[in-house]
């Protein structure tokens, strides 16, 4: 739940058109972690001592997160209004910025009715399927990249761990650039679909080619699925006007998405060495799920925006003023980001 929880938290502080880059920076940390994680694991596995290498690895990778979690509990504010590092005027500005999109509304606490409303909102489910497809790859690729490289037949274990880093360095750059551009043009779907398509091409190369250079190039392409992950999380935060409804949508996203690793971590059995074609084709199919669902979500939101435009025209084109809390979303000047 930590992955979807951070974008939800960021949505409390930033307007919709600035959320992509912030979420992208957060997710890019996963790419950087994978860039050095394999080398770190290999180095620790060679350590000699009274404590088993796997125990040392758990300590080295787990203790910093646990300590920072304690620090975050006391230091991270619940909302702009409770940020102790801001004075009263700065808090008011931060709240105004986070609610700048017409239709976005601040609510007091979790509203169960709105959370349940997200279950009935058809726009909550395509992102969950996209997140599932991404997590099939997101969970399996970092685990098996060193093995895939070593099975190419031209590299030692040390070289394989070292060669695992460049694809993720490129991925880190791609996440940040794509998130920045997504904010600039105020679009999410095309970047999600584009990242998944590039990753699908990479998996096709890995499944069909035997040349070492081509397969290694395919890894660079396959890691671009991380771009889609970052912007799917952003898109969910952009699609709902209240914190409670966003929370419900993120719960749906996490529930569907976390089924992906169940499949992803079992698609590269040793019996499929050296090319792991079955796993590559399954991962390619998962990327295509993201492509199809991304296009479908764009269509649904485009259609919803047209409906909202017609409602606005019937009401005289007035997009100003506050609407009563009980009215539906068609009655508020809210427009979906495609």
Give residue ranges: language-model regions.
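Intracellular juxtamembrane helix-capping segments at the cytosolic ends
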Residues: 1-14, 227-242, 250
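Glycine-rich segments within core transmembrane alpha-helices of 12-TM secondary carriers
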Residues: 18-53, 58-65, 250-264
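Intracellular terminal tails of multi-pass secondary transporters
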Residues: 73-107, 246, 275-338
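Structural signature of the two symmetry-related core transmembrane helices
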Residues: 189-205, 228
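Helix-loop junctions at membrane interfaces in 12-TM secondary transporters
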Residues: 208-217
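A late C-terminal transmembrane helix in Major Facilitator Superfamily
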Residues: 243-275, 282, 286
